[in-house]
Amino acid sequence: MTDPLNPTRLQNHPALARIIESGRTNLPTGITTSGALSAYAQNAAAIIRDNREREKVEIADLNNRLARYVEKVRFLEAQNRVLENDIGVFRNAAHTHSERIAVYFESEKASLFTLVRENKAKISTAEQNIRKLEPDVISAKKNLESSFQLRVQTREDKRSQMKILSNLEAENSYIKRLTTDCEEEKSRVHSEISRLRSDIKRVHALRDKERSKHSSSSQELLKRLNGCISQHDIAIREEISKARRDTTNKNRDYFHNELHAAMKEIRDRFEKDSRAARKTWEDWYHKKITEIKKGSESYSSIQNQAREEILRIRSIVNEFRGKLSDSETINQQLIKRIDDLHFQDKENLRLFEIALNEKENLVIKMREECTKLSVELDKLVENQINLRNEINHYRKLMENAEHLRTTVQTHVTYNAPPPPLPQSGPRTTSYHAYGSAYNDSLL
């Protein structure tokens, strides 16, 4: 907003400059001492400005509405003048064209009747063509229904074959699972056999170890016995040498008896110990032999059972392989049969679609011809209705003209100038050529 105390503005308003120079205290209520407007004054000025703008917009809108109204009034006045001229022309030409109009409408009526008869003949021929095509359409529908039934039958056959195929696949998967189970059982039996072989090897190793241990202990015992024998021989020789030194017979007998008794006692103890050791060793060997025999018998029984199980599994696997090969051959035959049926179904469907499209094209052509005939018939009916309306309108005009003529003859003699004739001759065409808008304007 501009400053009211601007020097350029004060130069243009000398009275305001004198008031400001006379005293700053005598300012109006809307202006402050610094020369600017107060907030209240600014608000009032803005409201006044908005009101002025709104009034300007309303005045412009009213001006536009008034201009449109004036244009409409002028247009309606021009139309009224045109209609008055047309009414004058019709009044002047009524007494000259009354007979010609009747003849013209009679000829047009006859031509319309001929057109209606031709259209009826066309409609009858179209109906005959439709009746001729009805058996083809019925046969096409029957073929369609039969093809649908064949399609349903083929689908049912396909589903049954798919069911058989799924059963064969299920049996195949079951056989494969049994084969894997047999392979697992075979691997388990092989692992059990390997474990038993390792146990046998371990038992043989323990047996060899114990045998070597006992043989070493027996060798050591023999060495100890030989040492004891050598010591005893040495002691005996010493005693014999001592006895030889003793020359008395009594001592000799005593030593001989003691020596024989000691030797007998040693021999008895040795035989007793050897018998006990032999008995213990024989018992231990018999025990170990029985244990080994029992282990070998259990191992042989397990091995025989495993061998029988392997033979049984092999027979089952061979049987399953034969069934699997048979099912695979049947599966291949069914797949080939399904492919052949698919191809045959597609071919039949393609041929049927071609025939159906041809029939549909024929039906569409007949429908188009029927629609064209119906449109032409509607046009003819509309033309007939318009002609009847025009005849009624001209009849009313003629009646009005006759009424005006009688009234003029009874009251006032009216000398009307003859109507201007066209250069190319009298007008005999129908107002129907101008369309329905001209008829509405006449009405």
From Swiss-Prot:
Residues 55-405 form the IF rod domain. Signal peptide: none annotated. The lineage of its organism: Eukaryota, Metazoa, Ecdysozoa, Nematoda, Chromadorea. It is found in: Cytoplasm. Residues 105-239 are annotated as: Coil 1B. Its main location: cytoplasm. It comes from Caenorhabditis elegans. Residues 59-90 are annotated as: Coil 1A. Residues 240-257 are annotated as: Linker 12. GO terms for biological process: heterochromatin formation; nuclear envelope organization; nuclear migration; nuclear pore localization; protein localization to nuclear envelope. One of its GO terms (cellular component) is intermediate filament. The keyword Amino-acid biosynthesis does not apply. Residues 258-403 are annotated as: Coil 2. Residues 404-443 are annotated as: Tail. This is Intermediate filament protein ifd-2.
